[in-house]
Amino acid sequence: TIMSHNVP
């Protein structure tokens, strides 16, 4: 995801 840099 864009909000969480950790996962897509």
Swiss-Prot record:
Keywords: Allergen. It comes from the Eukaryota. The N-terminus is blocked. The MW of the complete protein is 65 kDa with a pI of 3.6. This is Allergen Fus s I3596*. It comes from Fusarium vanettenii. The lineage of its organism: Eukaryota, Fungi, Dikarya, Ascomycota, Pezizomycotina.
